[in-house]
Regions:
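Two-metal-ion RNase H-like nuclease active-site motif
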Residues: 42, 54-64
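Short conserved beta-strand segments at catalytic cores or DNA/RNA-binding microdomains
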Residues: 61-94, 103
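RNase H-like polynucleotidyl transferase catalytic core
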Residues: 21-27, 120-125, 139-158
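Basic, flexible linker segments flanking DNA-binding modules
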Residues: 1-51, 152
Length: 170
C-alpha cells in the first residue's frame, strides 16, 4: 500500500502519534524603539568578509528552556574563527545580559592584544544592542557598530547555523 505524506500525517495525528508543534516561543528582538539604528557595514561593495581574528564579532540572543521557564542566552561570536568570545545567560531580555557578554568579548580581545578599533560589532536592531549603555561601551573601545537593515536574518546566520552544535545539542 502506498500513501502520501499528508495522509500519513493525518493517520498519525488521529492516533495521537504527533507532537504538538504550536508551542509558544519567546520573542528575542524588539526593533520597535526610538534608539539610533546604525548602518549595515556588511552590505557594502565589495562584500565584507572576516579574514582574521578580531575583524568582526556577531551578536545575537537565543532562548533556552531551563525546565523552570525561558532564559535568554546572549552570544558574541568571532566571525573568522567562529569562537564564542562572549556569553551570558539571563532570565530577562534586559540589556544586562548582552552587556555582560560584550564585557567578556572585550576582555578576550584585550587578552590577546587585538586592536578593537578595526573590529566590527554586527547585530540585529534589537533594543538591547541600540541602548545607550551598550553603544557607549562599544564606543569606549572604538568598536565599529553595524546592524542588519530591514530585518535581514541572513547576516546573523553565523550564529544560528552553529548554535545547536556549540551548545551541545547535536
Amino acid at each position: 500500500m502506498v500513501i502520501g505524506r499528508d495522509r500519513c500525517y493525518d493517520i498519525f495525528r488521529s492516533n495521537g502519534l504527533c507532537q504538538r508543534t504550536s508551542r509558544k516561543r519567546p520573542k528575542t528582538t524588539n526593533s520597535n524603539h526610538n534608539y539610533y539604528i546604525y548602518p549595515d557595514l556588511l552590505n557594502v561593495a565589495p562584500k565584507f568578509v572576516a579574514t582574521r581574528l578580531g575583524a568582526m564579532v556577531v551578536a545575537d540572543i537565543t532562548y533556552v528552556n531551563t525546565g523552570q521557564g525561558w532564559a535568554y542566552l546572549s552570544l558574541l561570536t568571532d566571525a573568522s574563527s567562529r569562537a564564542i568570545v562572549g556569553y551570558a545567560l539571563y532570565k530577562t531580555l534586559e540589556t544586562e545580559g548582552p552587556l555582560k557578554a560584550l564585557e567578556m568579548a572585550i576582555s578576550f580581545y584585550e587578552k590577546y592584544h587585538i586592536d578593537m578599533s578595526t573590529l566590527i560589532h554586527h547585530s540585529d536592531r534589537g533594543v538591547q544592542y541600540c541602548s545607550n549603555k551598550y553603544v557607549e561601551r562599544l564606543k569606549e573601545h572604538q568598536i565599529n557598530i553595524s546592524m542588519t537593515q530591514c530585518g535581514d536574518p541572513l547576516h546573523l546566520s553565523l550564529i544560528h547555523i552553529s548554535e545547536p552544535t556549540r551548545l551541545g545539542m547535536i
